[in-house]
């Protein structure tokens, strides 16, 4: 029988945080920052102005759809984030946890970019980035494993 506590309990957070170190903290904070909206907006602007206007517009639509879907899902499920004692960052954050917006947007944005570029090395790079952004959210204690997996799943659908 599957134990739902694996997805929405603190076991995954505790397992990752058992390796806590200032270096890992900094590394995972950097990966989380790569999943912030302002990074995506900057990349979209650079793409639009420097490379390909059509791709920049498409990227905007893809991310906008993902953001609306994430908001709707968070409001629908209304699930809390992990307790603040597990959080390395955002200790006072009261936003909803499921699904992880960082994981969802990473899958949506980097997955779309990988499909557009169609190069093996970019696909590997983008998949690794998606994985590390999701993992960072668990390590930093701001999401449960289930939040991140839900974000990845909803990212695939947006």
Where are these regions (language model features)?
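Alpha-helical transmembrane segments
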Residues: 1, 62-67, 126-130
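N-terminal transmembrane-helix/juxtamembrane module of multi-pass inner/ER membrane proteins
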Residues: 1-39, 70-95
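Membrane-embedded catalytic cores of phosphoryl/pyrophosphoryl-handling enzymes
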Residues: 28, 43-44, 57, 82-158
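Polybasic, low-complexity association/targeting segments
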Residues: 38-62
């Amino acid at each position: 029988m599957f134990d739902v506590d694996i997805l929405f309990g603190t076991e995954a957070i505790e397992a990752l945080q058992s390796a806590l170190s200032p270096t890992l903290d900094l590394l995972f904070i950097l990966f989380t920052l790569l999943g912030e909206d302002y990074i995506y907006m900057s990349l979209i602007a650079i793409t639009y102005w420097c490379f390909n206007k059509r791709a920049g517009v498409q990227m905007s639509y893809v991310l906008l759809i993902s953001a609306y879907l994430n908001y709707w899902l968070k409001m629908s499920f209304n699930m809390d984030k992990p307790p603040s004692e597990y959080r390395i960052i955002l200790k006072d954050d009261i936003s909803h946890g499921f699904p992880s917006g960082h994981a969802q947007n990473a899958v949506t944005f980097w997955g779309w970019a990988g499909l557009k570029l169609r190069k093996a090395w970019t696909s590997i790079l983008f998949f690794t980035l998606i994985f590390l952004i999701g993992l960072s959210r668990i390590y930093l204690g701001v999401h449960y494993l289930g939040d991140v997996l839900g974000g990845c799943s909803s990212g695939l659908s947006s």
